[in-house]
Structure formats: C-alpha cells, structure tokens
C-alpha cells in the first residue's frame, strides 16, 4: 500500500561535497546542454529552474506535500522539478491524476529504478518492483487472488462472517481491555503504541496464522522494525537522486539495509515453515493461499509467468508492511480526531448505540446502518492525508499529458495531499466536516463524494489491500467507540501537527478513556 521516497534536506558532509565539486562541471554541462527533443504539437514541461547537482532540493524542504502544492499553483497540475540529478514530474489535481493513472494507466504504470528499491524485500517487493509489466501484473494478480480467497474464507465461529472479521473483532475486544487496564494502572495511555500492536496482531493472523500476546518479544520486534523502517525511509536517501553518493559511507543506508535484512529473515522463516506444513485442504492464512495459487500455476502448462518462492516472500513482506502501517496510522489519527471533536465522538456513539446496541459487538454487516461512521473515516483520510504521496510512478514509454511531453522512464510523483485539499474540489478543505460525505438528509453515505478522496492510489498500481484496510479501520473504530469514550488529559493541549515520514503520524501523546455504559468490567 502507499509509500514515498523524498529526500531529507540536510547539509552534505565534507566527503560528499568534494565528490560533488569534482563532478559538478561535467554534470552541469550535461544538464544544461542535453535537451530531449520535444515532438511537434507538444510543450516542454514547466517548472522551477534547478541548481547544478542538487536540483530543487533546497526548495522542497521538510514538508514536500505543501511545497509541491504551492508550486502547482504557479506552474499548473503537470510540472517538473529536479531532485538531485533526476528529473521528476509532479502531478496534481483530480482530473489530471485520473487522466494519467486511469485513462492512460499503461503509460504511467511503471516504478522508477531508484537505488534503494532493490534492497526492499531483497529486490522481490511487489509494491516497489521495477519488473516488466507482464511479470509484475502476474505477481499482482497472484497477490490479489490470495487476498480475496482469504478475506472470504469462512470462520469456524458462526458469530463471524469470515476469518478477517473474526481476527479484527477478537483483537478489537482485546484492545479495549488493554486500554481499560492501562487507565486503571496509569491513568492514561499512548494511543499509537496500543493500536499499533493490535493491528500488527491482526496482520500476523491474516498473513501468518498466528496471534501473539501484546508483550511477546517477537511481536514487539516486528512493531519496532516497522517503526524504524518508516523513520528511515521517510527521511529519504539522496543516493536515489545523486548517484555518486552511493559510493560514500552512510549511517542511514546501513540502518536501512539492516532493517530490511532482519524483516526478510523473519518472513523467510515463516514462509519456510508454511511450505513444510502446507495442506491444500486446509488453507490457514494468506501465506498458505499464496502457496496454493503458486502450486496451481506450476501445474498449469499454459501459464506463461511463474512466480518463484522468493517472490512469495516479497509479496508477504509487502502485504504485512503496507497493511500494518496504513491501518495503524489511520486508526491512531481517528482516535486523535475523536478527542479533538467530542461532539462528533458522541454522535458516532449514538449512531452505533441506535443501530447496533451495546449488548453485542459491531460487525461488518452493520456498515450500511452506520453512514456517519463511514463519513467520519473518509474525512479523516481526506483531512489528515497521512499518505501524502503514492509510491513514485514511472512512465513506461514516451507519452504526453495536458499537452506536455513526458519521456519514457521519467519518475512521477502523485500529490494526494493536494487533491484532498483542493478548494476546487472541496468546500472549506481545511475544515474537518464528516457531513460533507452524507446525503442531504444525513441518512446515507454520498459515495460519489467519497470516491474523490485519494489515499490508496488509482489505476493499475492502486493498493490491492484497500478493501481489507477500509474494513479493518471501520470495524476497529466501531468496536472502540461502542465501548470507550476518549478524552484529552486535563490541561494538556492536543497537537495535531503531522510529522512527515513514510506515513504522516501525529506526535506521540497520552490520552484518557472511560468505559461506556453497560461496558464496565
């Protein structure tokens, strides 16, 4: 699901500066005098003038989503910047992005060959893959089939419609107990940490068929690895854009490689255990489902593209990492918004109380009767835009967009944050208002408005786990709102300023919660 590699702007070391000085004249001449020939009838891409070697990195700053939004107002929805020595096309505006990713989807379906991408999942990552379109499409189809098979897998417990629902409900109930226990012991809790562990457990159940105690060392290590990965990748790596830096010592790169290596070893161990115990008549989880689909492919003589066992590891790695980070970040932001808008929190509780009651746990089948909760989630996705960019795209051939020529193999950034805050698309875009996604009488979800929100990408590279992620956020939220009422700590203001990274997270804080009526334990 959604990531972005944008550089962290800091001062270069002495050795980096020396290398830059040695190459600056040659590279500057190349950048200055080598121009791509523009076909007749098309225009050259507009954009700010880059500096030699570093390009426009000084202009991008620490909040690239805002900087690039400001530049789109100056240059339009299609413009070019230069990060280091690599030209990057930035797309903004809903119509332009939909034209590129849906109507011209094949042209923009590639991934740029960034240096760091080859180290994610040992180069076998589905999300970051630079494989040829046919190979990538076969792997994506396999992953999608495995997800669909598992999400529809029947639960052994008749209370639940499927295994996914069972995993979420059981973990949601345990999360409520954990938060209540923390309140009794400490008087407050860290919403992010508790939610992260619960979501990780759901993902572990889905991918690996196992549930951990919240304090299990293996689970804690997985959570810590994911947080470290987000911090390191979120700050970016200039070596992706200034190739000469690849040959210089880098503490951040060493940490990045170490994190990937440790997680790969964990997933390989799990996949190996699954192969050893695999039973076609007993599909336990997504890993089993992937193995099952791969075995069917091996038996199919008409199948042109086979998927290696190593690439199964990459797919599992992607599904775990993306699903875990997106859902946990979305849920932790949800709790922050509940606290920031207590009147909305109370309205959500009343909707759940009226439609579901307090005697049983909410289920996925209750969703049609909880339109305000769905509207609340959509507004969180839009207002926070905690995934401000998609993973970078890349053009697969020479193409054009809005009358501008874009060469093959051009890196493309999709500014989702701009779309979600575009005043031409939204009334009062910086106001938090879930009602914008309801029908005029407030009784139904306005799905057409909801489709304008962009968080999971679009087109051929759209997140394959989107439906599962949305179901997770919905069900987790319904459960905790039904059981708990969240509050700020007295005298402590709530800081909703996002911290830029792999996904934009709120600052860590302490909150309070009280059990709702009929839920005292």
Curated annotation (Swiss-Prot):
Protein name, UniProt field: Cytochrome P450 1A1
Role summary: Cytochromes P450 are a group of heme-thiolate monooxygenases. They oxidize a variety of structurally unrelated compounds, including steroids, fatty acids, and xenobiotics.
Top-level lineage group: Eukaryota
Family annotation (InterPro entries): Cyt_P450, Cyt_P450_CS, Cyt_P450_E_grp-I, Cyt_P450_E_grp-I_CYP1, Cyt_P450_sf
Any GO BP: hormone biosynthetic process
Family: Belongs to the cytochrome P450 family.
Location, primary (coarse class): endoplasmic reticulum
Keywords of the record: Endoplasmic reticulum, Heme, Iron, Membrane, Metal-binding, Microsome, Monooxygenase, Oxidoreductase
Top class in the EC scheme: oxidoreductase
Enzyme Commission number(s) from the entry: 1.14.14.1
Reaction catalysis annotation: an organic molecule + reduced [NADPH--hemoprotein reductase] + O2 = an alcohol + oxidized [NADPH--hemoprotein reductase] + H2O + H(+)
GO cellular component: endoplasmic reticulum membrane
